[in-house]
Each structure stands twice: as C-alpha cells, then as structure tokens.
C-alpha cells in the first residue's frame, strides 16, 4: 500500500485528463500541456519541501525525454543521466525510465539501464490510466527506486562519488 508521505506527494501532483499518446496528434498536444503542468507543479512542490531531485526536458514532439536526477548520501551528491521514450501505447503503458550508466550494476534493472518497476509501480499505473503521467512516474517510480538502490550500490562500491573517481585517476 501507499504510505502517508507518498499519498501527500501524489495529492499535490495534478491528475491528467486527456487519454492520448504520440499517435493522437491534436490530443497529444493537449496531453503534453497537461504533462508539463503536472511536472512543473511537482518540481515546484519539491523545491518548497527542499526535496529537489531531478530535471527533465523533452524533444519538440514530447516523445523523447532526458535529464538528470540526483541522490544525496553522507552530504555528497550523486548525479545520474536519465532518459526515456514515451511508448506508442502511452498512457496505457508507462514510460520505462533508464539510467544507462548504472546498467549491469543491479539486478533491479533491465537491458539498456531501464529501472525495474514491475512489482509495485506498473499495477498502480494501470489502475490510474489516464490520470497518471510523467510526474507520477518520477514520484512513484524513479524516486523510490533511487532511494533504495543508490545507497545499496554505494555501500557495495559499485557507485562512487565523482570526487572519489577523480582522486583515483
């Protein structure tokens, strides 16, 4: 089930109304507007809560997204490139968020660095089509994944802070 903090986060992200994917042309433009509004609201909420942890941008068509996410541990910032494509069957199918530089470092990842979200996130997404969008995928998918996986990867020495990497060279 969803904990109280997650419920609070979700309640502050606008729900989307337009059920449209990249093939739906005019409706897709409307959906993209809703996506951007939800993302802007989510980022603003995070900044107010001193919990700013990602930046995203897209190509002109809104079908390819890329940016950075970060995780703080022991007062050190670990930053990662993220990317994903909007599936043709979106919003029925959730985007598969990838962190390519972490590929092969954890079992909770698929080929290409796509993070594993099947057990918890995908059923929740399926029950909330078309209300959930990219901001929800970040809040319910990537955010919790980073919170669990990155500390584990750091403790195993599989992820190092960029300052530590430079000192070793």
Curated annotation (Swiss-Prot):
Leader sequence segment: none
SUPFAM superfamilies reported for this sequence: UBC-like (SSF54495)
Keyword terms of this UniProt record: Ubl conjugation pathway
GO molecular function: UFM1 conjugating enzyme activity; UFM1 transferase activity
List of catalytic residues: 116 (glycyl thioester intermediate)
Tagged with keyword Signal: no
Gene Ontology biological process terms in this record: protein ufmylation; response to endoplasmic reticulum stress; reticulophagy
Keyword Transferase part of the UniProt annotation: no
InterPro entries, per the entry: UBQ-conjugating_enzyme/RWD, Ufc1
TM region(s), chain numbering: none
Superkingdom of the source species: Eukaryota
Pfam families: UFC1 (PF08694)
Family indicated by similarity: Belongs to the ubiquitin-conjugating enzyme family. UFC1 subfamily.
Chain's role: E2-like enzyme which forms an intermediate with UFM1 via a thioester linkage.
Entry protein name: Ubiquitin-fold modifier-conjugating enzyme 1
């Amino acid at each position: 089930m969803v904990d109280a903090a997650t419920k609070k986060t979700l309640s502050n992200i606008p729900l989307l109304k337009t059920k449209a994917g990249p093939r739906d042309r005019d409706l897709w433009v409307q959906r993209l507007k809703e996506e951007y509004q939800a993302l802007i609201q989510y980022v603003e909420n995070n900044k107010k809560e001193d919990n700013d942890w990602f930046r995203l941008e897209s190509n002109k068509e809104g079908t390819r997204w890329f940016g950075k996410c970060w995780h703080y541990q022991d007062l050190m910032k670990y930053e990662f490139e993220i990317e994903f494509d909007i599936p043709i069957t979106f919003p029925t199918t959730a985007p598969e968020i990838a962190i390519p530089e972490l590929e092969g470092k954890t079992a909770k990842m698929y080929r290409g660095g796509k993070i594993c979200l099947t057990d918890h996130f995908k059923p929740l997404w399926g029950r909330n089509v078309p209300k959930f969008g990219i901001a929800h995928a970040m809040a319910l998918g990537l955010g919790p994944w980073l919170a669990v996986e990155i500390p584990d990867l750091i403790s195993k020495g599989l992820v190092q802070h960029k300052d530590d990497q430079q000192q070793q060279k």
